[in-house]
Curated annotation (Swiss-Prot):
The cytoplasmic region mediates the interaction with HN and M proteins. The gene is F. It is found in: Virion membrane; Host cell membrane. It is a single-pass type I membrane protein; Single-pass membrane protein. It comes from Sendai virus (strain Hamamatsu). The record marks R116, F117 as: Cleavage. Keywords: Coiled coil, Disulfide bond, Fusion of virus membrane with host cell membrane, Fusion of virus membrane with host membrane, Glycoprotein, Host cell membrane, Host membrane, Membrane, Signal, Transmembrane, Transmembrane helix, Viral envelope protein, Viral penetration into host cytoplasm, Virion, Virus entry into host cell. It holds the Pfam family Fusion_gly. Gene3D superfamilies: 1.10.287.2480, Head and neck region of the ectodomain of NDV fusion glycoprotein, Newcastle disease virus like domain. Disulfide bonds join C70-C199, C338-C347, C362-C370, C394-C399, C401-C424. This is Fusion glycoprotein F0. GO terms for biological process: fusion of virus membrane with host plasma membrane; symbiont entry into host cell.
Length: 565
């Protein structure tokens, strides 16, 4: 049976290698490099869909049951240091528990613990609606309450034992790692030293060791003790602090050695303080270790692009920043939520994305389908590192080779130039000097004739020159407009000015006064004439406004006519 299992494992590993090789070979990296597209060898994909939980109970004060009270004063001083560190943390946890409560608690018997978190209802007291941060804190609180009974038993047993590490497992398969610090030092060094050096010397040694331990404690768990949120555990400091092998501590994780390496490398082991006991000076941390699942036959390649030349014109191919290749699928990869280790991308979900058909065929080697755009500025990269060498566009850039700074002349039929330590050594691009890797090999990869697709709009069009011309035109038109305004302001100024209006008003007043004076003079003249010539003495030849018929009646003319009759 064991032989059969080994054969199955070997066949699975062989198939995985074959699939990975086929996937990596379907992207013609040499052909793409000739148009400035650089694609690396790729890394595998692992999905972190779930996690395992651990609880680390830290006993921060050793049990000092020494004779004659040796070391008691040093322990009291050490506890005062711990109080300043732990009291704010304890108060924050109390506030969290006051705001976030778990209802519908499931009763558990004393013998058989039951998992009741998934049946719990997370609610709030002081806040109306639970936010995501509150729910996260509520989950941690619920998990802490689940393990509360087991943690209490651990604390009780740790106060009665001198064992340094106890690994216990509760009923739901979660493990509580109890670390009792300094106990080995007290048992192995302090007690024997009392009989040899005396109480005072032993107490001083204990005080020095406690101070050293406090410093190492802050180094190992400073980020975790500074907040009630989730922080990465410093595993190297944990290993140094407790003189334990991290691999041995994590042997119970249901995962392979490579997964453990990826988890440690990316610092994905998170710890959260869920309990602070100031009576026993114990701190409980909830530790989450992600469970990784590798997706077979999948590689994620990092892609980039530099400018290249065709017939003296500079062009640029746009490609996704990351390419995901699967047996029959080629697309982009959204790694915004992923973390990268040396050999793997660890993602919470499948990062595959669809890309246009033309871009897909371009990545597969059909350069006639590559979407290109003409380079109109200097922001496009001109060189990149490939296989220990440098690929550069030496038509659009100034390239030199060797310590003598020999200029490099690029063939106009070639899009880029490949430079390595063997054919160049010291490489210079636009004044930047680069030393190629001595182990790098010639990366020319057989230069081929280049044909690319038509230029398309794949990014905002650069119209900086047109905008500059339009800006100059606007400035000129503004100057002309100001001149026109000045001319218009001068036209009609004589009647629009305030002095003109005042002059008109004064003239009108003078004319009005003259008219009034003339009327008064005429009136007085007529009056004087009437007073000097009464009505009876007016000459008949004198012209008056009175009708002549009136004189006929008043001067006897009518009586003469009667006598004649």
């Amino acid at each position: 049976m064991a032989t059969y299992i080994q054969r199955v494992q070997c066949i699975s590993a062989l198939l995985s290698v074959v699939l990975t090789t086929l996937v990596s070979c379907q992207i013609p990296r040499d052909r793409l490099s000739n148009i400035g597209v650089i694609v690396d060898e790729g890394k595998s994909l692992k999905i972190a869909g779930s996690h395992e939980s651990r609880y680390i109970v830290l006993s921060l004060v050793p049990g000092v049951d020494l004779e004659n009270g040796c070391g008691t004063a040093q322990v009291i001083q050490y506890k005062s240091l711990l109080n300043r560190l732990l009291i704010p943390l304890r108060d924050a946890l109390d506030l969290q528990e006051a705001l976030i409560t778990v209802t519908n608690d499931t009763m558990t018997s004393a013998d058989v613990p039951q998992s009741r978190f998934f049946g719990a209802v997370i609610g709030t007291i002081a806040l109306g609606v639970a936010t995501s941060a509150q729910i996260t804190a509520g989950i941690a609180l619920a998990e802490a309450r689940e393990a509360k009974r087991d943690i209490a038993l651990i604390k009780e047993s740790m106060t009665k034992t001198h064992k340094s590490i106890e690994l216990l497992q509760n009923a739901v398969g979660e493990q509580i790692l109890a670390l009792k610090t300094l106990q080995d030092f007290v048992n192995d060094e302090i007690k024997p030293a009392i009989s040899e050096l005396g109480c005072e010397t032993a107490a001083l040694r204990l005080g020095i060791k406690l101070t050293q331990h406090y410093s190492e404690l802050l180094t190992a768990f400073g980020s975790n003790f500074g907040t009630i949120g989730e922080k990465s555990l410093t595993l190297q400091a944990l290993s140094s602090l407790y003189s334990a092998n991290i691999t041995e501590i994590m042997t119970t994780i249901r995962t392979g050695q490579s997964n453990i390496y990826d988890v440690i490398y990316t610092e994905q082991i998170k710890g959260t303080v869920i309990d602070v006991d100031l009576e026993r000076y114990m701190v409980t941390l909830s530790v989450k270790i992600p469970i990784l699942s590798e997706v077979p036959g999948v590689l994620i390649h990092k892609a980039s692009s530099i400018s290249y030349n065709i017939d003296g014109e500079e062009w640029y191919v746009t490609v996704p920043s990351h390419i995901l290749s699967r047996a029959s699928f080629l697309g982009g990869a959204n790694i915004a939520d992923c973390v990268e280790s040396r050999l793997t991308y660890i993602c919470p979900r499948d990062p595959a994305q669809l890309i246009p058909d033309s871009q897909q065929k371009c990545i597969l080697g059909d350069t006639t389908r590559c979407p290109v755009t003409k380079v109109v500025d200097n922001l496009i990269p001109k060189f990149a590192f490939v296989n220990g060498g440098v690929v550069a566009n030496c038509i659009a850039s100034t390239c030199t080779c060797g310590t003598g700074r020999r200029p490099i002349s690029q063939d106009r039929s070639k899009g880029v130039v490949f430079l390595t330590h063997d054919n160049c050594g010291l490489i210079g691009v636009n004044g930047i000097e680069l030393y190629a890797n001595r182990k790098g090999h010639d990366a020319t990869w057989g230069v081929q004739n280049l044909t690319v697709g038509p230029a398309i709009a794949i990014r905002p069009v650069d119209i900086s020159l047109n905008l500059a011309a339009a800006t100059d035109f606007l400035q000129d038109s503004r100057a002309e407009l100001e001149k026109a305004r000045k001319i218009l302001s001068e036209v009609g100024r004589w009647y629009n000015s305030g002095a003109t209006l005042i002059t008109i008003i004064v003239v009108m007043i003078v004319v009005l006064v003259v008219i009034i004076v003339i009327v008064i003079v005429l009136y007085r003249l007529r009056r004087s004439m009437l007073m000097s010539n009464p009505a009876g003495r007016i000459s008949r030849d004198t012209y008056t406004l009175e009708p002549k018929i009136r004189h006929m009646y008043t001067n006897g003319g009518f009586d003469a006519m009667t006598e004649k009759r």
